Amino acid sequence: MLRDFSDEAKQKLLQYVKDVTSTTTWDTITDFFGDIGLTVQGWFGKLDIQNYVNDVDAYHKKILDKNDTTTQQIETIFTDVQAVDTKYISVVSQQISCGNNIIKLINDLADTINPNGGNMDMSRMKGVLEADVEDIRNSKATVEKTIEEKMLGTDAEGCMNSEDPVNLSTGNFIYEHEDLKIGGEIPLSFHRYYNSKDSRRGVLGNCFLHNYQISLEKEKNGTVGVRLADGQINYYDKNEQGEYVGRNTALEFLKETEEGYILIHPGQERISFDREGKMLRKENMNGRGISFSYLEDGKLEKAEADNGSSLTYNYNKEEQLEKVTDHTGRTVLLQYQGKELKKVITASGAEYAYRYGENGRITEVENARQVTSVKNLYDRRFRIIHQEFPDGGTMTFAYDDKNRRVTLTERNGSKIIHVHDDRYRNIETIYEDGTKEKYLYNDKNQCISKTDRLGRTTRMAYDNRGNLTQTVDAMKRRVNYTYDADCHLLSVSINGKERLKNHYDAKGNLTGTENLYGNRVAVKNDEAGRPQAVTYADGSFLEISYDERGNIVKLKDVSGSVTTYGYDALNRVTETVDANSNVTRYAYDAANRITAVTDALGNQRAYTYNPGGKIMAIRDFDGNEAGFTYNPLGKVETYTDKEGQTVHFTYDKMWNISSVTAPDQGRQEYIYDSNNRLVKQTLPMGGVVTYAYDAAGNRTEMTDPAGNTTRYCYDDVNRLTEVLEADGARTAYEYDREGNLIKETNAAGQVTSYTYDDLGRRTSVTNPAGATTSVFYNELGKAERICYPNGSSTVYEYEKGGRLKSVRYPDGAGEHYGCLLYTSPSP
């Protein structure tokens, strides 16, 4: 039997389903029943099918619901089938290795039997057992290690993180900090990442990496691993066609070239490696990017962007990175104690210190304010088991490896259980009240189903390249996405109707986008893929000019007004000149923070910062100053305004605001439940307001200081459907499939209804008396006419580009708007 799981076959199946559920088809059926009229009503009665005919629309909805399920199944089947070969390739070599070790054990045991008498050599057998069992354990550990390496980093797919953060599947402690940054069209930065479960040692010592240590490693079996900036490793296996297939990754693919390898993220970037696995070039789809050069021993020497920005790396005699310098001379210094990074001093003078335990892992992190921001305890597998914070709060982590559960005990004592599968993907989160969130994934670690704490499920589907193609919520509302061959978004459809369409040039730059009414925004790009001109649906246009480094130097808006921009060597805006020649200037510190803004009249607003980079004081243009103080957690403790009035803030164990004390000593207090939802508010005069919630976090009750309770109800996608006041008054709300409010029924039973166009814009309001007010829009989506029930109207007129020009009211009165240009008097 021929098995066809090509994309063409999948699309054919999807079209069959689409044809069955076509709105046109069902409209034809409905029209048919209406057209045949009374002549066949008797047949319906005799056949007892009148109810089915009357309910044809409801039946169509059932078919649509079934379509959602069928389409989801088709997407899932094809994704799963296409993943079979990939999954087989990804594990076969490791499983064969493990199996070979087991076979070797059997053969070795057989060799310990004396062929003459059948007796075993017990001493030899003991040695064989110890050696071969260790080999089997090592093979199994290699498989597990490969999976864990995929889950390193700040954003491991399918995993959740705690506050500091800790990976709630693997127990990995994650830390990151950006020490130096150069902005502009092609940003450069020195960004450090730490993974407690990363066993490798590099130029930053144990477990640390920086963002340009992306590298490629080829294994003996032909598998290629790509270590990303944050430490995560993605593996690519070579198939029979010689192509490298991502083991558990979406979108990216690896290509072998004569020079080495290229990692391609379609529509975004390309990373080139040499044969030794060193990253040589990182560039966008227009070829603009960063080049990397290395010392003879293979260590990174320089990262240089095409716009002239650069970072230079210097090492000590132990081959540890000790200095990073940008092209303007700003420097980051790194200090070590043995093989461990001890301190980092940034260009602004901020210092970050690290202390380690006997296991070589970070036990304390000291921030730039000389506050120990976290203290860590680990188990023997380098997993976090306890954390302590500056306010004395603690978090604990308990691991049930047999059942694949991690229990997090929060700072407020609440316990949340995270359940993971054999690939460390979070498949279930269990809360103290017994409610659960559930997750399903495809073979590329993409979530295909999420069920919330109320049992409501949202489903996602992806194409074979990993692009999201459909979401279906708990009320069967569908959003579909299509892409071109380079994974650029082509269209968005909601409930079967296309709402957005995009167009691209050969390089993948956006050249236009249009809505379902054909209103289009066109984009003209330069050779580097930068927008030069944007033309809107009304014919108005925006023009943009750039300097040689790719910075915007001139912007001509739709009204013809021109603003120009000046930059420093770090591509930071240092001045702007508006259409009236008013100049505003900006100054920065070594950490790229604005320290002063000087307006056209010479008035200055100044900012000062604490060592952690938070604003301490603002001296305004009028010379008056406002200030902030912070607690050890870095949260605002006091705010003093320009009049000297001070507001005080306190926080609970979960770092929620627990009280606010105003300058007049009026105090509001706040109490939260175990899910950090506000449940009690004490007002300055002593009154108390309480709140209740459902498992999804929707507010279901509010009781005011007088004891009056208002209740709220919601539908399956968390839209408010009913408000029940304390006096029994009831207000109900109804929505269409797009989520627009279409009907509001008040306590007296009076109905206000609403209609919308296909872009979700409200087109009419009909009051309880049946009088309708209508709204009409222009091609820019701005209201151009409001027609009232008595036939009168308000008319809005706009300039090109959408700026309001005039308003004419029903009584004939009007308003006109214009731009007043200021010209300096002649001397």
Language-model segments: what does each one mean?
Residues 198-200:
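Short, solvent-exposed loop/turn elements at domain surfaces
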